[in-house]
Amino acid sequence: MIQTFNELGALRGQIAQWKREGLRVALVPTMGNLHGGHHSLVTLARQYADKVVASIFVNPTQFGPNEDFSRYPRTPEDDVAGLEQVGCDAVWLPSVEAMYPLGVDRTTRMHAPGVSEVLEGASRPGHFDGVCTVVARLFLQVQPDVAVFGRKDYQQLAVIKQMVAELSFPIQIVGADIVRDEDGLAKSSRNQYLSAEQRPVATTIHRTLLGMREGYVAGQARDRIEAEATAALQAAGFQVDYAVLRTPELAEPTFDGGGRVALIAARLGTTRLIDNLEF
């Protein structure tokens, strides 16, 4: 049976017992409202560890002033039931007060310069500071041997890898492949905000990413690829934040050849969607 923890001392006691037994522990951080994509992270984590802990915490420090923290769906009972079905061993459910004992406005914050300041960081200033702040605390609370994050949030994964390397966290960071619906739409908690009419339109994002890859393979100039991608999304009714090609490190390419990642962030109505494709 899955264990749930609301108190840090009890969680640490259980993890200490596992480690005394020589067991490896994996952490899967989430904000709840879980779907198949999240469940795949737990399944992957089981390949790297003997015990899997998922955290559910809607983190106020990563929401911007125009982003409704209170609107984020909270479904803890369903989340725990789903985690149990995929073999999660424990769920950590901290309160805001436990995570930020001095209060959200007075808390010590983390910042990963460079990679956190472009793309999503430019569109959502301070977002990755909040991500780093909460992830660092989760690492200190759970002390996992490995942590699993989805590649759908490609930039978030890059930011966390930078923070872990710079601060020498003794934690292996694993990126999990994007889970998609049959029509290509990446699974996301935000998909539930799409209307019945918007849902098929949202698949334009994945088709556009595939087109960006085709353009790159065909030798098209990056500026042309990005311009055509933006135009395709706008024609479908999206408000585009960015549609870009970057190196795996998220730098602007300075030469042809080498790996690339295409990244898109766009708003359909009031719903902001992100996706990417590595090639």
Where are these regions (language model features)?
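Nucleotidyltransferase catalytic core that binds NTPs
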Residues: 2-238, 246, 270, 277
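Short, solvent-exposed loop/turn elements at beta->coil junctions and helix N-caps
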Residues: 246-252
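Short, basic/aromatic-enriched C-terminal tail that caps enzymatic domains
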Residues: 252-255, 261-279
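A structure-centric signal for secondary-structure junctions around beta-strands
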Residues: 23, 258-259
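Substrate/ligand-engaging "lid" and interaction regions
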Residues: 243
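A residue-level signal for beta-strand positions that form part of recognition/binding surfaces
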Residues: 1-2, 261
